[in-house]
Amino acid sequence: MNFSHLYDIYYNRINKKLFEIIQELPFQDSVLFRAMKYSTLSGGKRLRACLIYATGETFQVNIAALDVISAAVELVHSYSLIHDDLPCIDNDYFRRGKISCHIKYGENFALLAGDALQGLAFNILSNSNMPGVHDSIRLKMIAEFSNAIGYSGMCIGQMLDLEKERKKINISELEKINLYKTAFLIRCSIRLAYFASNNFSKEVLFILDKFSVSIGLAFQIQDDILDLKNDIKKLESKRNKTKNTYPLLIGLKKSKIKIKELYKEAFFTLEILKKNFNVNILKLLTQFIMKRFK
């Protein structure tokens, strides 16, 4: 079985859901609406949504509930990218093959668009129908979501990234940045899908956390490598000018070895889950993501 077909199904499903959510918003003639729509529907890999759907399949979660979780997570991811690109953070002119939101609509409206998308994500997670999900579980999901994207998660990761910019750091410090900045939202995505199954087990959650952190860290290193496009001259010329990344810190060869180690850890956790659950789709998804850097 090939995951590509299933990826297309997940990808199209979440894009349709996001389009429906955006199209239901008021003030559609406003710059704010256009900025939100532009950033949310301008492509992207939808990795987090795919992980949510695949995890949901593993634990037999109603797909309508997975739609809600996926939409909330992807809206927050879009918000984070808008803010990451701002001049005060990464000052990036391009995102997903297009000009960044603040370049197209201005810094003021980009800032507001990010804020509005975050609020919309919580609105969706709080109020949308999620069949089979009790209110107590919904509250647990909201608490997990807010923790993953706030002070104890994504925001502290971004702070650490900015704080260490242009400074020499070690691998341990870099992994901490990637853990908070990237892996924790991926962990949250998988946790929310698992919570929606209403079958909570600390042991299973621990295994899923190991899986998601391995995937999240590997994915971040892959992105760092893809950004450099294996251009050694670019690597050398930017060594003292760019943010800290694995390829800049330890080189491309060791970075690829690290990716393989992380995916090996991810597959190991799936083998443990395999004893009680059907993890075939999660395994196929992991293999699919792995191919991005080969």
Swiss-Prot record:
Keywords: Cytoplasm, Isoprene biosynthesis, Magnesium, Metal-binding, Transferase. Mg(2+) 1 binds at D84, D90. Mg(2+) 2 binds at D84, D90. It catalyses: isopentenyl diphosphate + (2E)-geranyl diphosphate = (2E,6E)-farnesyl diphosphate + diphosphate. GO terms for biological process: isoprenoid biosynthetic process. PROSITE patterns: POLYPRENYL_SYNTHASE_1, POLYPRENYL_SYNTHASE_2. Belongs to the FPP/GGPP synthase family. This is Farnesyl diphosphate synthase. The gene is ispA.
